[in-house]
UniProtKB/Swiss-Prot annotation:
Function per UniProt: This enzyme is involved in nucleotide metabolism: it produces dUMP, the immediate precursor of thymidine nucleotides and it decreases the intracellular concentration of dUTP so that uracil cannot be incorporated into DNA.
Keywords attached to this entry: Hydrolase, Magnesium, Metal-binding, Nucleotide metabolism
One family name in Pfam for this protein: dUTPase
Protein name, UniProt field: Deoxyuridine 5'-triphosphate nucleotidohydrolase
Enzyme class: hydrolase
Residues that hold substrate according to the record: 70-72, 83, 87-89, 97
Catalysed conversion reaction: dUTP + H2O = dUMP + diphosphate + H(+)
Gene3D superfamilies in the cross-refs: 2.70.40.10
Pathway involvement of the protein, from the record: Pyrimidine metabolism; dUMP biosynthesis; dUMP from dCTP (dUTP route): step 2/2
Family: Belongs to the dUTPase family.
Length: 151
């Protein structure tokens, strides 16, 4: 298992609020919690930036982290990420913040310590470009937006 540096920015983490952990041996994501002093009420269409009380430093340029929505919050309550996905670069060292958007039709209350998103680590490939006039022919070519069929 890869070791990532974690800085606790709020004393409640690890005491009142659990440290991020994998729910099962097969889990890809670690739950991130709302590190709030009081509940936050999100009206329909509203977006708020929610602190997690944590900072990470991945350090390895071959890795990044993504902040992803929790499927149950999105499906049942319309609570998703305001930026759809958060990308955490390997050299970032600031607090992890979660942009939470209520795309639903009713207000939703986020409680202190509530699980609001998940953190997934992923490999990174940094690419360089080779400028060309034409590409080698492929089966797909320039076809996009459904050109490969519906089913």
């Amino acid at each position: 298992m890869k070791q990532i540096e974690l800085k606790i920015l709020d004393a409640r983490i690890g005491n009142e609020f659990p440290l991020p952990e994998y729910a099962t041996p097969g889990s890809a994501g670690l739950d991130l919690r709302a590190c709030l002093d009081a509940a936050v009420v999100l009206a329909p269409g509203e977006t708020q930036l929610i602190p997690t009380g944590l900072a990470i430093h991945i350090a390895d340029p071959g890795l990044c982290a993504t902040i992803l929505p929790r499927s149950g919050l999105g499906h049942k309550h319309g609570i998703v990420l305001g930026n759809l996905v958060g990308l955490i670069d390997s050299d970032y060292q600031g607090q992890l913040m979660v942009s939470v958007w209520n795309r639903g039709n009713t207000t939703f209350t986020i409680q202190p310590g509530e699980r609001i998103a998940q953190l997934v680590f992923m490999p990174v490939v940094q690419a360089s470009f080779n400028i060309v006039d034409d590409f080698d022919t492929s089966e797909r070519g320039e076809g996009g937006f459904g050109s490969s069929g519906r089913h």
